Amino acid sequence: MDMDKDRDLFGTEIKEMLRESIQRVVKGSFSSHDDDPVFYTRESYPGKTRIEELPLYPKGIPDVIRSWANLYAKTNYAPEDILVLDLETTGLGRGGTLAFMIGLGYYEGDQFWVEQIFLPDPDAEEHSFERLQELMRERSLLITFNGKSFDVPVLEARLLYHQIWLDI
């Protein structure tokens, strides 16, 4: 009896059961990576609210935010320039903390898209950054809630760990 072989087979069966369970409950799909795929969800919303057709995106960024975020170099950002980012993590520290969910929001045409990238297994972490990299190359303004003090430092640490170079 080969214990390592049995453990690998058992682990693979558990992962498959987990993937099937997730897909039954949550609308989304797994990435095409044979080894350690990540789970993606994607949903679009109209670019206007239901109350008096108010836009989700304001015409201008208030001066106090512009000053705090050092955005005076460029005065007009189009909705398509924006990428909203939020992380859900395994802890509050920077070292050893994994982002088990990367939440992304962005405008495409008259729709606001929300994507969530779930990490079903820590081994899939490197794959979880692929969509983030793609969207960050296309957009010039990153909006976060705790980005300066938490999300960006966590991302930088995890990207460095995987030797992925991304200018955040």
Ranges and model annotations:
Residues 1-78:
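N-terminal accessory regions of nucleic-acid-interacting proteins
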Residues 78-79, 96-98, 136-140:
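Short, well-ordered loop/turn elements at secondary-structure boundaries
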Residues 75-77, 91-96, 163:
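Hydrophobic, well-ordered secondary-structure scaffolds
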Residues 93-120:
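RNase H-like nuclease fold core
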Residues 51, 93-98, 129, 154-155:
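Short, conserved acidic/polar surface loops in the N-terminal third of protein domains
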Residues 80-90:
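Two-metal-ion RNase H-like nuclease active-site motif
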Residues 112-168:
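Conserved DEDDh/DEDDy metal-dependent 3′-5′ exonuclease domain
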